[in-house]
Structures are given as structure tokens and as C-alpha cells.
């Protein structure tokens, strides 16, 4: 099979002409369908060609934030990652993106199934993309929110940007839900730090979405969200609620996040 059309796609990708990439991908998929190459074949040259097409499909889809298309291409390329083919230079990136996609969807069981299905387990240790996502998932599951935020802030993989924002939003919502149950009010500026938001405007937007009341620079949580059941069945009432200082230090904010993580773990146990 000629690589002429594939070279053209590679050139379009390098030029970041995403619309042209999509059109070229469509042409190539028609060719793949004609030759029954949507499933792995014993012809290594053809299988490698199909794998390349699907890999480009994954990367173009994430660049254009077309997640439905991304999921489709990811499911099509993964069966082509087997030992009989020469390893793909894009395998780590595509695998990492697929794992991050599953994490962003909170499909944790599928995340671990996908890990188990990776034919080259050494990828976990030598590939920076896969290793990074595995570490991120571990921190999310452990409630290590500071580590999650730090990893996302310092990540140098631009292809991960879309899904990282979703994961950070998941963490933020988890913190917000726990915060509602732990105390009845919190200074707006402290909430901004606690929720890893850039400024109070973002916090005000989140407050509106969650039905929080803001008065005089203080967020008041809904009463019905304040009761929290402990492991012994007792409820924390208003007298037991935590009181934040007017200006919490970074250490205080970090300690609160640890408490919220512990609170979340208690709820999972109960």
C-alpha cells in the first residue's frame, strides 16, 4: 500500500490544518474499509498503515476537541498495538490520552482494564505519557488533591490539556461537595485557594452554579448540605463545624484539603 496519502496527512498535521486533516482522514478510512483494515491483519505493512491512520485520527480529534471522534479512533487503534508489529512512536501518547480520557469520564474500572490490556507493560515505566497518567490517577483516587493540582499545573504535554481540565473540575467538585458538609461558611478568598481557582470571579461563578449564597465576601453553604455522618453514625452539627480564619495561610488551606480528603474517604467506607 502506498504511503503517499499518509505522508500528505502527516504534512497537514504538522501544519496544524485540522479541517484538511479531517477530510484526508475520511478519504483514508474509505480506503481502509475497502481493504477490510478496520481490524488487525497478518499483513504487517497494511496493519501498520491502518494503525498510523487511526493514531492520526486520535491526535486530530483531541486537537479539535471532538471527543466522540476521539473515543472512536482510540477504540480502533488499540487492537493494532500488538507484538507482531514494529512498535509505534506514538503508542505512549495515544495510550496515555486514552487512559486520561477514561479517568476524566470517571470510568475507573475501564481505566484499569485498559492498563491490563496494554501488551507492552514496560510502557508503564519508560513512557512519560503513560507514567504521568498512572500517577495522576493514583493521586486522584487517594484524594491527594494538592498533588493532582501540582501535576496538572506543571504538565508539559499540551495534548493532555482538554482532559486535564475535566479531571481538575472533578477534583474541584469533590472538594466543593465535601466543603458543603464540613462547614456552613467560608471566606470567598479562601474558597478560591481551596478550590484551585484563579480568582474570585471564578469562585463566584462556581458558587452560583452550586446554589451558594455570597454576602460580604463570605460564602454561605445551603443548610441541608451541612450535616455529615461520621463512621460511628454521629452527625456533625453547627457547633462542631470548622471555623476558618479570615485569612487562611497556605498551610491551613492544605490542611483543610487533607481533611476534606479524609471526609470523602469516610463517606466511601460508610
Curated annotation (Swiss-Prot):
PROSITE patterns: PCI
Record-linked Pfam families: CSN8_PSD8_EIF3K (PF10075)
InterPro entries in the cross-refs: 26S_Psome_Rpn12, CSN8_PSD8_EIF3K, PCI_dom
Domain annotation PCI: ranges: 65-237
Gene3D superfamilies: 1.25.40.990
Superkingdom field: Eukaryota
Any GO BP annotation: proteasome-mediated ubiquitin-dependent protein catabolic process
GO cellular component terms, semicolon-separated: chromatin; cytosol; nuclear periphery; nucleus; proteasome regulatory particle, lid subcomplex
Record keywords, A-Z: Proteasome
Purpose of the protein: Acts as a regulatory subunit of the 26S proteasome which is involved in the ATP-dependent degradation of ubiquitinated proteins.
Family as reported in the entry's similarity comment: Belongs to the proteasome subunit S14 family.
Protein name: 26S proteasome regulatory subunit rpn12
Upper taxonomic lineage: Eukaryota, Fungi, Dikarya, Ascomycota, Taphrinomycotina
Designated gene of the protein: rpn12
Amino acid at each position: 500500500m502506498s504511503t503517499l496519502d499518509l505522508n500528505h496527512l502527516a504534512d497537514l498535521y504538522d501544519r496544524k490544518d485540522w479541517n484538511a486533516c479531517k477530510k484526508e482522514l475520511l478519504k483514508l478510512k474509505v480506503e481502509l474499509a475497502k481493504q477490510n483494515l478496520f481490524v488487525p491483519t497478518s499483513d504487517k505493512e497494511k496493519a501498520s498503515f491502518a494503525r498510523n491512520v487511526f493514531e492520526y485520527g486520535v491526535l486530530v480529534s483531541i486537537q479539535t476537541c471532538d471527543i466522540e471522534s476521539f473515543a472512536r479512533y482510540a477504540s480502533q487503534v488499540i487492537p493494532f498495538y500488538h507484538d507482531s508489529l514494529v512498535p509505534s512512536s506514538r503508542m505512549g501518547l495515544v495510550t496515555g490520552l486514552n487512559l486520561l480520557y477514561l479517568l476524566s469520564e470517571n470510568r475507573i474500572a475501564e481505566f484499569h482494564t485498559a492498563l491490563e490490556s496494554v501488551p507492552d507493560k514496560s510502557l508503564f515505566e519508560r513512557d512519560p505519557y503513560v507514567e504521568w497518567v498512572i500517577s495522576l490517577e493514583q493521586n486522584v483516587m487517594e484524594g491527594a488533591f494538592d498533588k493532582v493540582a501540582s501535576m496538572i499545573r506543571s504538565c508539559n504535554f499540551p495534548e493532555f490539556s482538554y482532559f486535564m481540565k475535566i479531571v481538575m473540575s472533578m477534583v474541584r467538585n469533590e472538594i466543593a461537595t465535601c466543603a458543603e458538609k464540613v462547614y456552613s461558611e467560608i471566606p470567598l478568598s479562601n474558597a478560591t485557594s481551596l478550590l484551585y481557582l484563579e480568582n474570585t470571579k471564578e469562585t463566584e461563578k462556581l458558587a452560583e452554579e452550586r446554589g451558594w449564597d455570597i454576602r460580604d465576601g463570605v460564602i454561605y453553604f445551603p443548610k441541608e448540605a451541612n450535616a455529615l455522618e461520621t463512621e460511628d453514625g454521629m452527625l456533625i452539627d453547627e457547633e462542631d463545624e470548622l471555623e476558618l480564619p479570615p485569612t487562611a495561610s497556605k498551610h491551613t488551606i492544605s490542611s483543610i484539603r487533607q481533611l476534606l480528603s479524609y471526609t470523602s474517604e469516610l463517606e466511601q467506607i460508610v
